[in-house]
Structure formats: structure tokens, C-alpha cells
Amino acid sequence: MFDLFPIHGGVCAPEGFSADGIAAGLKKEGKLDVAFVHSLFPAKVSALFTTNRFAAAPIRYFQGLGEVFDCNFVLINAKNANAMTGAEGIEDIEWLMERLKHRFPSLVNPVMSSTGVIGARLPKEKIEASLGEIVLGKKEGARAAQAIMTTDAFSKEVAFKVELPDGRSFCIGAMAKGAGMIDPAMATMLCFITTDADVPENRMKELLQKAVHTTFNAISVDGDTSTNDTVMLFSNKASGVYEEEAFLMALERVMHKLATDVARDGEGAKKLVAFEVSGAASEEEAIKAAKALTTSLLVKTAIFGEDPNWGRIASTIGSSGVECDENRLRISFGEVLVYDRGAILFDKTIEEKAASVMRQESFKIHCDLGIGRGKFTAYGCDLGYEYVKINADYRT
């Protein structure tokens, strides 16, 4: 039906988009800490945000502009979340946006996104002083992805070209950041998606919601939902091409790649784990069980220790509130079945095989509840000493 090819460029891959990262002095040692994404052509933007009741100022500012609106520029800063800053947080954004528009009159409804420490005013003067370094049209997507990092171990970007059977094509690119305070109730930490596909304005939000459901909504690092979670989609229609099935597939691929990168990059994490739950009474029940596994500290520390302690998995499912029965439950590490509908298969040989699975950097734990047909896969990681160190020293 259509072909999907990985390409370079991240958010700059689609036609008409540019991005860069600059150093505004927010991070130490002159590191990149402010980024922008810009569309040369008129663009529409739609976004989904955190369900945290204390949503940060950039989110409250954005929400005042509507569900889908004209916008060709986003400014992103690290080190400061601009959260719990009240009316002054909004005023600081308005102050910066006015100066941006004065410097670059072609900008339409520029918006802002922030990540970092909660409870401190935005260092707007430092950011304003760095605006002179912005060069619209610069295609430095990798630098932009680096600039938005906080405790991330690596930058996260991806891009695809989609070719339709008639030879027409469009591109989609994205970047994300996130490693800690990840348990999105709708998005991720920060994710910015660009496309030159001619996405209908009235379809943008629904397609975003569909793709988020099985990607960013399916990950957890530490069970905490940020005040700043944002996933933002820009469409500038530059290709003039759109086919909904192909676009949704590409959007899901982009989000899946970035979501699993975020889970893999859990602060100090060494392992990415897919928690596959099947046989639940409904998809909602499967989601509840899978997410309980991603956030269980006992499960996460067992993964860190490469200990196939299946009892912790059973206990977590049993306390998750879903319908379950120990005489129907099956638990596997990879393809190694350790518990089968009331029968304990966990002898020394099975334990070593299961431990061998857990020594891999990426593996799955499968739980068949044996109740119905509901299924869902959530992604998580281990939790070890480094997580405590990173977060204990976060503000130093």
C-alpha cells in the first residue's frame, strides 16, 4: 500500500522546517539549552498536554490559543519548567513572545515549551539575550534535540519518508526529551513532531490522540506525571500529499520510537522492558495491569538485579484491581514460561533461562490473565542506584 523509509534530519526532515539549539547560559559549561522549531510555510499546530492539575505556564498559555491554530514557531528552554509560577509565568512568556515577534515579524502565534526545575521564575532576560543567535532556516535538528535534554543520557530524534503507490510522498520528523518524571497520563515529557503532509485541520487532534494511546501513554519510568508533558504536531502541508492510513502509521512509528527511547533512557536505566498483558477482561483492564507492572518498585528493582522473581509480577497484578485468577494466569520472561495456570515451573533450569532473558538490554515479560480478550503492551525500565543519585542531586 505504501512504503516507509527512515531518513536523517529529525524535525528538519519535512520540507520547510528548520531548527537549531543555542546556548543561553541556563546550563553550565556553555551547553545548548534553548531550541526552536520553525516552519517557513504557514502551519497548523495541535497538541496534547499533561493531566497534572498544576500544568505549567507554557501549557496554560498554549491552551488559550485553541485546539488547532496557525503557528509556525516554538521556542523551547531547558533547566526551568516555568511551573507553579502563577500569573507571572504567563506574563514572562508573553514578554518573550513579543520580543520574538519584534525580531522576527514573520512569526505567527509563536508558542513556548519548557522543562526543568519546578517553582522558579523563567530566566527571561537570559533567554531574550540569546534570541540574536537564532537563524531561521538553519537545519540543525540534532542540536535542537540536544538543547532540550535535562537528565537525558542521549538525545532523541527520528524521521521517516512515506511513499504512496502513485509515487507521491511526504515526510514526518520528531524530537523528544525525557528520562525522569515519566508516567504520562496522556503525552510524554516533551515531543515535537513536524510533517509536510497535508493533514486536514479537523483530523489533527484525533490522529494525535490515537497515536499517543499506544505509545507515549504506554510508558513509565518512575510513576510521576510531569507538570509540563507536551506532544505537539506541526503540519505545514508543503508536500500537498495526504493519505490517512499512511500518515497514521507513520505517526505511530515516530511516536513508538521516541516513547521507547524515553523508557530506555529512564534515569540510570540499563534495560527496556515490554510488559505484554493479554487475556484481560477488556483493554482497559489490560492497560491497568500493564501500567501497574511498569510502576512497581519491586518489579523494577528485580529487573535491575536481573532476578526473575515472578512472584513480584503476580503480586502486582493481583493488587492492580483487575479481574484475575491464579489458576488462569500465565507468566513468561521472553519465551520462558515460569508459571502456568496454577503450576509453578520455576526450577533451577527455568530460573537460569529466565535470568538469561533478563540479562538482555531489551526483553519482554508476558502475562496472560486467561479471562478475556483484552490486551495492551506498556513499556518500562529498571530502577537502580543511579536513579536515586541523579534525583538526589537534581538541583545541584
Curated annotation (Swiss-Prot):
GO terms for cellular component: cytoplasm. It is an enzyme of class 2 (transferase). Substrate binds at T150, K177, T188, E267, N391, T396. The active site is at T188 (nucleophile). Pfam families: ArgJ. Its main location: cytoplasm. HAMAP family: ArgJ (MF_01106). Catalyzes two activities which are involved in the cyclic version of arginine biosynthesis: the synthesis of N-acetylglutamate from glutamate and acetyl-CoA as the acetyl donor, and of ornithine by transacetylation between N(2)-acetylornithine and glutamate. Heterotetramer of two alpha and two beta chains. NCBIfam families: ArgJ, PRK05388.1. This is Arginine biosynthesis bifunctional protein ArgJ. It comes from Wolinella succinogenes (strain ATCC 29543 / DSM 1740 / CCUG 13145 / JCM 31913 / LMG 7466 / NCTC 11488 / FDC 602W) (Vibrio succinogenes).
